[in-house]
Regions:
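Short membrane-interface helical motifs at transmembrane helix boundaries
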Residues: 123-154, 344-356
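Membrane-interface helix-loop junctions in multi-pass transport and translocation proteins
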Residues: 190-224, 228, 355
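Small-residue-rich hydrophobic transmembrane alpha-helices
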Residues: 66-126, 163-182, 290-353
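Structural signal for membrane-spanning alpha-helices in multi-pass inner-membrane proteins
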Residues: 128, 171, 197, 201, ...
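Residue-level recognition of transmembrane alpha-helices
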Residues: 36, 43, 70-73, 117, ...
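Interhelical loop/hinge segments that connect adjacent transmembrane helices in multipass membrane
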Residues: 2, 10-34, 215, 226-268
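Signature of the first transmembrane helix
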Residues: 30-91, 95, 259-279
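Helix-terminus/linker motif at the lipid-water interface of multi-pass membrane proteins
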Residues: 44, 48-66, 136-143, 199-206, ...
Length: 356
């Protein structure tokens, strides 16, 4: 499904903020790579602090705790995947208006997206906590793992607002070409998470509960940093908390792009709940092996995900300014780069598979 928005291109280009990147001019390949690299680094750190969670509980708590933390990913990703689809819709709309030099429309889209995030955060907290017993039942969770999973998920969903605000805020920054500062914030968040993991588990003996609290505190830190930057932003995506409201025409545009992506990501994640259910039949040891595999799989796919996000911003800005051919060229170049990177990464994974 294609969504075409009509923009008036006679507006003068506004002064760009320091970290903004205009992708409507210059080398397509250079823009994609320069934009994707901070995204890749940020995603690696995000995976790193997820791995730290599982490493800490696996080494200092128990094998059951390792399985519990590592195998709740499909449940979390079902809700997070839906939200990420919606936030991608906001990013597409913002990048198109930004490319078309419509700062007043960018302003409306930013404030609509952030208020939508707050509403979804409240809903996800309630739905996530309420769904946890049902999802664990669908996953056929072994009795020895279920208590730890319930504790982890309840705390995680209670603090999910931070994750949503960070993801929407960083998506807004990426829409105007700024992929560096979201990376810096993830770097800080990863450091906070690692320190708190070790403090809560080793010093206070909090086990899975400590790891969950460390995660939501770290996510809250990244959210505060992102919102602070948007509030102080010298550009069209400047956020004013007093101006938060739903602009209904803008919401329709965001939903039109976001819902298909949201459903795709949520359904894919939800299907993994049943896959995890089959794995869980074999007990905690098999669950631990599956957890280790999924971590490797996630690392390999990160470069392609980063290029995908880079191409979203590139295409959005160029469609906004009316340069359809350049947008198509960006998609082709992103596909070429993705195939090349995947081919390179497949070699060590296949060769080292027995040892991994």
């Amino acid at each position: 499904m294609q969504h075409h928005f009509h923009f008036h291109l006679h507006h003068h280009a506004p002064r760009r903020a320091r970290y903004d990147v205009d992708m409507t001019q210059g080398s397509t390949t250079r823009h994609l790579i320069n934009f994707a690299l901070p995204l890749l680094a940020g995603n690696l750190f995000q995976q790193l602090y997820n791995m730290v969670d599982t490493w800490v509980v696996g080494n200092f708590v128990s094998n059951e705790a390792f399985s519990a933390v590592g195998t709740v990913t499909p449940i979390i990703n079902t809700l997070i995947g839906f939200f990420l689809g919606m936030s991608s819709g906001a990013g597409v709309v913002i990048s198109q208006y930004y490319g078309a030099h419509r700062p007043e429309k960018v302003h409306e889209a930013v404030h609509t997206a952030m208020l939508l995030t707050i509403v979804m955060g409240v809903v996800f907290t309630g739905v996530g906590i309420a769904m946890t017993p049902l999802m664990l039942e669908l996953m056929k969770t072994p009795a020895e793992v279920a208590p730890d999973q319930t504790v982890y998920l309840t705390i995680y969903f209670a603090g999910i607002m931070g994750l949503l605000l960070y993801n929407m805020g960083s998506g807004i920054l990426r829409a105007v070409g700024d992929s560096r500062r979201p990376f810096y914030f993830l770097l800080v968040s990863a450091g906070v998470n690692t320190a708190l993991d070790l403090l809560f588990v080793l010093k206070f003996g909090m086990g899975v509960e400590g790891v969950a609290y460390a995660t939501i505190i770290a996510q809250a830190v990244s959210a505060v940093l992102t919102i602070a930057v948007l509030v102080r932003y010298d550009g069209s995506v400047k956020l004013s908390l007093r101006k938060l409201r739903i602009h209904w025409d803008m919401l329709k545009k965001i939903v039109a792009v976001g819902i298909p992506a949201a459903l795709q990501m949520a359904i894919t994640a939800f299907s993994n709940v049943f896959v995890q259910g089959y794995i869980n039949h074999f007990g905690a040891d098999c669950m631990s092996g599956w957890t280790a595999y999924t971590k490797i799989d996630q690392l390999v796919i990160l470069p392609v995900q980063s290029l995908s996000l880079a191409s979203t911003t590139f295409v959005g800005q160029n469609l906004g300014v009316g340069n359809v051919e350049r947008a198509k060229g960006g998609v082709r170049q992103a596909l070429y780069l993705s195939v090349a990177v995947t081919a390179v990464l497949l070699v060590p994974v296949l060769l080292l598979a027995p040892d991994l």
